[in-house]
């Protein structure tokens, strides 16, 4: 028995094999391998999975189409305004529509309404060849515009007219890649308008303007406003030294050290000594010149200022040679920023108000001549007139209002100031206040 034989090549292109089920299967000549086995029956799970995938593809395709249509064809301004107007009309009742029509006819010119209706009819003829509204005869208060059911028949606004009214430029398409520049003349007009319409914030601050001016100034111009102490020359060294007790001290000081500056004598008056002697025949012509001490008593003008150093009645106000404080000065000190100074002034004002209400100023002895006696009568009438002048001064100076503000915690934080103000108001009430109000 021969085990080895000749090797014979077979033709595989037409080779056909049969399966167990009697079906024929052909080999894949392209790859040289048999095809994968694909069973005919598919499980129910795979069928449901395929259905879900197909449904997702359909829904995603529809959404993409909707998005594409919405992005490709956006609503114009005219269309959006038209839709908004229709929504507003849908939400209105027939009575409201009639009322709005009457308001329009009463407020607008009939010629203007006729022109608007003519434009609407013109657009409606272009679409339907029939006018939407009848001709109007110009009678105010008559409406021929239909009812609420015909709001859907209203033609939309013209896109070009709306864009011109809203100053909207036409948008270029996606495929357009060219750039359009405005004319140079328009840019110049805009710049000129911007220059003429300067805002308040566009103006530079004063300090910045001064700094800019200084940058463009020469050194000679800058040194005109600047002065320095000159070096002592040999002639100045030989001059005699200045004596502060010299009556011409200010003139010599200016001549030696500041000859280039103008003389300002008024600013040096505070350096002058206070007048020591007062006129014994000093007459107080007005109650605003009366001065008081811290107890609320009157201070005569003959009292020397040297004797009041320990009591603190010397001051730097008007007439520093006179001791004490006037009501006007005390009211000014009652609004001081220093609480201690404010407390003393408020306490003094309270005592003065009490004594004015009690009429306890026995120092007020007026000189009554014949004319005064004929005009006012007795001494009591003259005294009442003087006290009335004091209360008028307090009213004009708003002393009571100032004390009320000082006693209010909303306006005054310092507790001591509030307590002194409350005490001063209490003294004012206890004294009786203005005697004229009692009558």
Swiss-Prot record:
State the GO CC annotations.
cytoplasm
Q: Which domain of life is it from?
A: Eukaryota
The record describes the protein's role as: Forms an interface between the RNA polymerase II enzyme and chaperone/scaffolding proteins, suggesting that it is required to connect RNA polymerase II to regulators of protein complex formation.
Q: Where is this region: Disordered?
A: 1-35, 49-79
Pfam families, from UniProt?
Answer: RPAP1_C, RPAP1_N
Q: Which GO terms describe its biological process?
A: transcription by RNA polymerase II
Q: Where are the transmembrane segments?
A: none
Comp. bias regions, Polar residues: 15-30
Keywords associated with the record: Cytoplasm, Transcription, Transcription regulation
What is this protein identified as?
RNA polymerase II-associated protein RBA50
Acetylation listed as a keyword: no
Q: What induces it?
A: Down-regulated at low calcium levels.
Q: Where in the cell is it found?
A: Cytoplasm
Q: Identify the PANTHER family for this entry.
A: RNA POLYMERASE II-ASSOCIATED PROTEIN 1
């Amino acid at each position: 028995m021969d085990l080895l034989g000749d090797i014979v090549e077979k033709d595989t292109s037409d080779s056909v094999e049969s399966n167990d089920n009697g079906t024929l299967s052909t080999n894949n000549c392209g790859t040289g391998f048999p095809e994968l086995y694909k069973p005919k029956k598919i499980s129910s799970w795979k069928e449901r999975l395929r259905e879900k995938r197909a449904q997702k593809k359909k829904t995603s395709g529809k959404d993409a189409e909707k998005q594409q249509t919405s992005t490709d064809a956006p609503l114009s301004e005219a269309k959006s305004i038209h839709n908004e107007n229709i929504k507003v009309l849908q939400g209105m009742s027939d009575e409201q529509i009639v009322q709005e029509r009457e308001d329009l006819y009463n407020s607008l010119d009939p010629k203007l309404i006729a022109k608007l209706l003519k434009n609407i009819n013109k657009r409606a003829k272009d679409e339907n060849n029939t006018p939407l509204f009848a001709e109007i005869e110009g009678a105010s208060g008559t409406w021929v515009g239909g009812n609420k059911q015909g709001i859907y028949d209203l033609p939309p606004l013209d896109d070009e007219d709306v864009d011109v009214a809203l100053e909207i430029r036409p948008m270029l398409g996606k495929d357009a890649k060219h750039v359009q520049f405005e004319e140079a003349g328009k840019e110049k007009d805009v710049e000129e308008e911007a220059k003429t319409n300067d805002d308040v914030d566009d103006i530079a601050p004063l300090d910045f303007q001064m700094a800019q001016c200084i940058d463009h100034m020469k050194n000679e111009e800058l040194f005109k406003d600047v002065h320095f102490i000159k070096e002592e020359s040999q002639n100045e060294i030989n001059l005699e030294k200045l004596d502060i007790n010299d009556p011409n001290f200010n003139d010599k000081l200016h001549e030696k050290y500041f000859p280039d500056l103008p003389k300002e004598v008024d600013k040096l008056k505070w350096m002058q000594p206070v007048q020591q002697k007062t006129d014994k025949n000093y007459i107080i012509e007005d109650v605003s010149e009366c001065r008081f001490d811290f107890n609320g008593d009157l201070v005569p003008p003959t009292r020397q200022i040297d004797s009041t150093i320990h009591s603190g009645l010397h001051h730097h106000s008007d007439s520093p040679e006179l001791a004490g404080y006037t009501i006007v000065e005390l009211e000014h000190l009652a609004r001081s920023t220093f609480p201690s100074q404010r407390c003393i002034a408020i306490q003094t004002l309270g005592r003065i108000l009490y004594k004015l209400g009690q009429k306890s100023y026995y120092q007020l002895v007026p000189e009554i001549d014949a004319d005064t006696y004929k005009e006012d009568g007795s001494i009591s009438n003259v005294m009442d007139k003087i006290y009335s002048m004091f209360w008028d001064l307090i009213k004009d100076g708003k002393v009571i209002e100032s004390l009320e503000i000082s006693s209010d915690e909303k306006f005054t934080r310092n507790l001591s100031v509030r307590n002194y103000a409350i005490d001063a108001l209490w003294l004012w009430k206890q004294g009786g206040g203005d005697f004229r109000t009692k009558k």
